[in-house]
């Protein structure tokens, strides 16, 4: 990596290892506009918004694709460059669906933001765009090609982070579009509904499917009893929209808000995560006893499960048969509320608040539909719940604290960290290790399972067996690891896979935020774990009692599922 000094707008700026001039400029405190630049993705250099002028040669080039050189002198805001950027914005707006007030991305749209920043009030160019059909076939996301500015962010995140390549460029010149191969609907592809394309989309071209209307109809229907479960990652992200720092746990305020909105009962998905930990640990120990099959994969991430079904079905025998915490809660609610519904003539309507768009797909899976109704009637993302609170005028910071309802509102610290990368694997290790001391907990926390590294490896000894563990962020990295396992280069007993970077805290349904926000959310979950009344799933008295009451056969019926090749 290069080291040196360059002049940026007359200011001396030292650089040491920055991969491009854009990074050096931002280091100098200048926020260069971009559409197509994400530091975690390859450099594309298509939008040309980040162009700079070399004061020595007069040459204009994209700073994202320029390597910094010692002695460079560049200008970022000359009259020539400002005119250049305004023209780009005008051209984009001329071929853009500008129904901004009704757009799902309004207020979070990069094109809208930069048009305001650069004072673009008039568009001098004619509207020559074609009108394309909106693709609403996916259970998780909606694709509107009429709002696409061809920045390529969705193409690269799908290929580089997830290794899926569902979206790509098609045609040439003025006919250029982003679409699935052969212009298929998303539902006709092998899309896993992770929603990361929507998370990086700079406009409203790809958005998470909005189901707020369905939620309000249920809440206002007197014949329905609306019960809600809240996932761990939601509590450390929802506050960001109301002035709380990323990572602050606002669960008790969110419970109050939901009750004010008309929800009857509010529970915590950590209750289901404790069920998952115990069931998955028992399954893992049984595999150790019987010699496999290994590796055993975690099954909490529905996008990961979908990927194996579509792309690597030979590994379906390796995936845990445990349902995700959301679906375990769904099955338990279906069982527990049946008699109550019959007695009072109401129908229990179950909503799950999740950080994840793939949960919308999971809730609609036939394995989780019984007697014509899904175990989870509706999945709302964190952003959808934020929108609902803002619609009602609720100010989260002004609310009193109210804990989730019992008995389904009690969860362990191990369950809370399900929301961050490595959390599921750590929860299983906590349960399986015979040593239950505080010192053992500290040792587990430094095994190497935590953090956002693409692939993390750790080992722990149980009895006479040294267990090999791995934690994977992103499907592209999972593919790499599977290839090494296939080739005999790697062996593991347990592998946790989360499709989203950083785990559920980085889910596509979370508030739009920087990478640092995701890291702080993960830190917030670990702080909540530290403060938890009990740290292990088997210490949850409600879960232990219910499992004893159900018995082994009924537990297996409610908590386990099998998957098949698609």
Which sequence ranges carry the predicted segments?
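A short, structure-level motif marking secondary-structure boundaries and short turns
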Residues: 5-8, 97, 130, 139-141, ...
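A generic secondary-structure micro-motif detector
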Residues: 10-12, 101, 134, 187, ...
């Amino acid at each position: 990596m290069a080291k040196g000094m360059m002049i940026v707008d007359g200011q001396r700026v030292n650089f040491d290892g920055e991969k491009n001039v854009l990074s050096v400029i931002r280091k100098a405190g200048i926020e260069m506009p971009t559409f197509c630049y994400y530091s975690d993705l390859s450099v594309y250099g298509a939008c040309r918004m980040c162009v700079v002028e070399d004061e020595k040669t007069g040459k204009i080039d994209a700073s994202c694709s320029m390597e910094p050189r010692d002695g460079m002198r560049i200008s970022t805001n000359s009259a020539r460059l400002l005119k250049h950027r305004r023209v780009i914005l005008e051209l984009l707006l001329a071929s853009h669906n500008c129904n901004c007030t009704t757009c799902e991305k309004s207020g979070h749209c990069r094109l809208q933001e930069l048009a305001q920043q650069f004072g673009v009030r008039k568009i001098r160019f004619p509207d020559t765009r074609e009108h394309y059909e909106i693709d609403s076939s996916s259970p998780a996301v909606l694709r509107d090609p009429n709002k696409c500015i061809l920045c390529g962010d969705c193409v690269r995140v799908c290929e580089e982070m997830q290794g899926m390549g569902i979206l790509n460029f098609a045609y040439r010149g003025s006919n250029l579009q982003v679409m699935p191969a052969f212009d298929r609907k998303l539902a006709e592809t092998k899309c896993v509904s992770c929603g990361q394309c929507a998370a990086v989309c700079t406009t409203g071209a790809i958005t998470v499917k909005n189901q707020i209307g369905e939620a309000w109809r249920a809440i206002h229907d007197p014949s329905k009893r609306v019960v809600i479960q809240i996932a761990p990652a939601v509590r450390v992200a929802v506050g960001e929209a109301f002035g709380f720092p990323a990572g602050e746990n606002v669960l008790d305020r969110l419970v109050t808000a939901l009750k004010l909105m008309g929800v009857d009962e509010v529970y915590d998905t950590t209750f289901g995560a404790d069920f998952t930990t115990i069931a998955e640990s028992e399954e893992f120990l049984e595999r150790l006893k019987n010699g496999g099959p290994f590796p055993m994969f975690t099954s909490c991430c529905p996008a990961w499960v979908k990927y194996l079904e579509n792309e690597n079905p030979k590994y379906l025998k390796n995936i845990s048969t445990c349902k995700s915490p959301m679906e375990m809660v769904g099955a338990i609610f279906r069982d527990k509320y049946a008699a109550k519904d019959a007695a009072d003539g109401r129908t229990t309507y179950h909503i799950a608040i999740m950080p994840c768009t793939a949960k919308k797909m999971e809730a609609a899976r036939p394995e989780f539909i019984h007697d014509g109704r899904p175990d989870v009637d509706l999945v709302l993302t964190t952003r959808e719940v934020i929108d609902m609170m803002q619609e009602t005028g609720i100010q989260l910071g002004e609310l009193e604290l109210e804990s989730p309802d019992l008995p389904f509102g009690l969860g362990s610290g191990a369950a809370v960290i399900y929301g961050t990368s490595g959390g599921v694997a750590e929860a299983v290790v906590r349960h399986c290790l015979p040593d239950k001391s505080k010192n053992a907990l500290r040792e587990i926390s430094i095994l190497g399972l935590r953090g956002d590294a693409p692939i993390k490896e750790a080992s722990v000894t149980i009895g006479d067996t040294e267990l090999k563990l791995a934690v994977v962020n992103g499907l592209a990295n999972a593919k790499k690891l599977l290839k090494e396992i296939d080739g005999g280069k790697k062996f593991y007993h347990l592998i946790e896979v989360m499709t989203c970077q950083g785990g559920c805290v980085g889910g596509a349904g979370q508030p739009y935020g920087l990478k640092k926000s995701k890291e702080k959310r993960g830190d917030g979950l670990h702080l909540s774990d530290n403060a938890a009344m009990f740290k292990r799933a088997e210490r949850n008295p409600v879960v232990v009692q219910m499992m004893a009451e159900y018995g082994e056969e009924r537990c297996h019926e409610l908590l386990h599922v099998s998957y098949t090749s698609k």
